[in-house]
Every structure is written in structure tokens, then in C-alpha cells.
């Protein structure tokens, strides 16, 4: 199998660049999960795969390049390959997932006593359906990660989680339904435990403009939303809470 990424955009001046080994990992993962999911990973599994990724592109950047947000591009490689091969192997792929890419929320500020605090919170969305089953709920795919537990967030930060719940009807409808996403509500306390103002939030995510697409006539899932006091936030700027 030859995967040719020629024509990919050139590397960018922000952190979305992907190094070759990251690109290869998600290409490998997609193909192996389709054709040999039960074989333990080993070097021989990759021997039938040839990856062509031109140097200097966003999928094979040259030093120096910022790569901290590489998942914003790299996580879509698996989805792209599934879609490309769905014509030939429809029973071995899944539709697009709401947890692609994994959503990272970076909260930071100062506690009441002046001590800095900082926390990275990871969340997933609904997983795409296959031809034989509905998608998993609240899943981080294709990354090997997990949703940050509420107990960790509240013990590590001054924030309060008022709500974490499945988002009804967020999965794409079809013969097989996409998995449900989640709604999570954070509150900055205003009591004796309140941190100093401002509380800053950085969001690294996707799906707020383009919804995860269905396959074989299935409908797309819901788009992501980021609200501050009930009002949509600016997804391209720094918002202080």
C-alpha cells in the first residue's frame, strides 16, 4: 500500500506542523486497524506500507518548525485514510469522530494566595459509527488518551465542574448512529476559594466549524461549541474568564 501525501500544504508558522514519524504512526494505525487489527504491533506490520510525505510540508516539516499542536493536523490522517479506502473496504472503516482531534483546554492563572496554577484538560467526542455498530460515546480517537476525570480537575485547580453529561442527539443520525459527545460546564468560584482574576483559557480543538462527516449516506454529527457565560467565544483569540 502506497500512501502519497504529495500536494499537502507547506509547513506553517504555528504549532500545527507534523513530523514524519507522527504522520507515519497515524497512517500505520489506520491501515493496520483495517486489515490486521488482531496482530500485536511489530516492525513487520509496517513492511507493506510505503509513505510518501514531501519534506517541508505540514505532514513532514523541516527544522525549525513549531509542532506542539501537531495533533490538530495529524489526528485527521486516520480519518482521511478511512474515507479514501471506504470505497474498497466499507466494512472495515468508521465515519468521522467528534474526538478528532482530541480537545485540549489549558486553564491558568493565580490562586488567591498568589501561587500560579495551570492545568491541561483533555476531552473527547462521539466516535464515528461503522457499518455494523453505533459509535462509542465520548471517546478520544484516534489518539491513545482519556477524558480528564472531574476529580482530578477539581483537586488540581480552583475550578468547579458544575456539569458533565452526554449530549443527547449529538451523534450523526443514520442506519448506525455516531457516538454521543459531551457537555461540560466549568465555573470560576466567587467565594473564599476564588482565584485571582483573570482566569485564562486556551483551547486547542476542532469541529467547531466543520462537523464530523458521516459515510455511506449517514448524516454529520454536531459541531463543537465553546461558550463563555453562555455566549460563543472567539475561537481564534485569547479569552479571559
Predicted features and spans:
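Glycine/proline-enriched, intrinsically flexible loops and inter-domain linkers
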Residues: 1-241
Amino acid at each position: 500500500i502506497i500512501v502519497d501525501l504529495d500536494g499537502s500544504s507547506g509547513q506553517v508558522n504555528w504549532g500545527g506542523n507534523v513530523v514524519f514519524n507522527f504522520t507515519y504512526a497515524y497512517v500505520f494505525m489506520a491501515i493496520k486497524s483495517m486489515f490486521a487489527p488482531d496482530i500485536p504491533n511489530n516492525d513487520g506490520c509496517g513492511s507493506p506500507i510505503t509513505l510518501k510525505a514531501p519534506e517541508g510540508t505540514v505532514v513532514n516539516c523541516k527544522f525549525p518548525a513549531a509542532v506542539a499542536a501537531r495533533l490538530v493536523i495529524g489526528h485527521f490522517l486516520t480519518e482521511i485514510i478511512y474515507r479514501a479506502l471506504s470505497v474498497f473496504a466499507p466494512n472495515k472503516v468508521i465515519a468521522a469522530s467528534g474526538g478528532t482531534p482530541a480537545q485540549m483546554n489549558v486553564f491558568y492563572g493565580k490562586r488567591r494566595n498568589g501561587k500560579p496554577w495551570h492545568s491541561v484538560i483533555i476531552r473527547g467526542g462521539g466516535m464515528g459509527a461503522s457499518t455494523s455498530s453505533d459509535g462509542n460515546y465520548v471517546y478520544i480517537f484516534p489518539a491513545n488518551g482519556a477524558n480528564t476525570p472531574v476529580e482530578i480537575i477539581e483537586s488540581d485547580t480552583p475550578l468547579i465542574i458544575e456539569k458533565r453529561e452526554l449530549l443527547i442527539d449529538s451523534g450523526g443520525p443514520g442506519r448506525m448512529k455516531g457516538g454521543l459527545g459531551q457537555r461540560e460546564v466549568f465555573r470560576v468560584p466567587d467565594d473564599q476559594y476564588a482565584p485571582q482574576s483573570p482566569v485564562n483559557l486556551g483551547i486547542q480543538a476542532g469541529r467547531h466549524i466543520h462537523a464530523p462527516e458521516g459515510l455511506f449516506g449517514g448524516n454529520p454529527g454536531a459541531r463543537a461549541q465553546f461558550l463563555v457565560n453562555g455566549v460563543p467565544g472567539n475561537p481564534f483569540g485569547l479569552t479571559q474568564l
